[in-house]
Amino acid sequence: MQRTMLKSKLHRVTATHADLHYEGSCAIDEDLLEAANIKEYEQIDIWNVNNGERFTTYAIRAERGSGVISVNGSAARRAAPGDILIIATFAVYNEVELAKHEPDLIYVDTQNRIVRRGHKIPVQAAA
């Protein structure tokens, strides 16, 4: 059996740009791409915490160390500078691969600088 699982997550990054007229995609600081194991042109899902929008595009590199998260092309209508975003990738794993699988979880500050890395999401406590 194969399962589609979370591969990478950039948690609560801040959109720095929204460029309607740039060729589609989402430009992501190269440091963040490497930390999250996201390849250039890889499909990404973006979830906008501010407005609830969810959309799919692909990643391109932004200047290393810049903190840039630029939502481009038609997707720019779904995010504005200052919006909080979650960027995720998924991959298909077989049962053998699943036994060793841990997603790359990257947490950032308000300037999109890495503050923590992880591989597990804590169990959510009952309210």
Curated annotation (Swiss-Prot):
Family, as annotated: Belongs to the PanD family.
One Gene Ontology cellular component annotation held by this UniProt entry: cytosol
Subcellular location: Cytoplasm
Active site residues according to the UniProt entry: S25 (schiff-base intermediate with substrate), Y58 (proton donor)
UniProt entry keywords in alphabetical sequence: Autocatalytic cleavage, Cytoplasm, Decarboxylase, Lyase, Pantothenate biosynthesis, Pyruvate, Schiff base, Zymogen
Name of the protein in question: Aspartate 1-decarboxylase
PTM remark: Is synthesized initially as an inactive proenzyme, which is activated by self-cleavage at a specific serine bond to produce a beta-subunit with a hydroxyl group at its C-terminus and an alpha-subunit with a pyruvoyl group at its N-terminus.
UniProt xrefs under InterPro entries: Asp_de-COase-like_dom_sf (IPR009010), Asp_decarbox (IPR003190)
Pathway in which this enzyme or protein is active: Cofactor biosynthesis; (R)-pantothenate biosynthesis; beta-alanine from L-aspartate: step 1/1
Function text: Catalyzes the pyruvoyl-dependent decarboxylation of aspartate to produce beta-alanine.
Catalysed conversion reaction: L-aspartate + H(+) = beta-alanine + CO2
Description of how the protein assembles with itself and partners: Heterooctamer of four alpha and four beta subunits.
Annotated positions of the Pyruvic acid (Ser) modification: S25
Gene this chain is encoded by: panD
UniProt xrefs under Gene3D superfamilies: 2.40.40.20
Residues at which substrate binds: T57, G73, S74, A75
Pfam families attached to this UniProt entry: Asp_decarbox
EC number assigned by the record: 4.1.1.11
Organism, as annotated: Dechloromonas aromatica (strain RCB)
Cofactors required: pyruvate
Origin superkingdom: Bacteria
Principal place of residence: cytoplasm
Cofactor binding, per record: Binds 1 pyruvoyl group covalently per subunit.
Gene Ontology molecular function, alphabetical: aspartate 1-decarboxylase activity
One Gene Ontology term from the biological process aspect of the record: pantothenate biosynthetic process
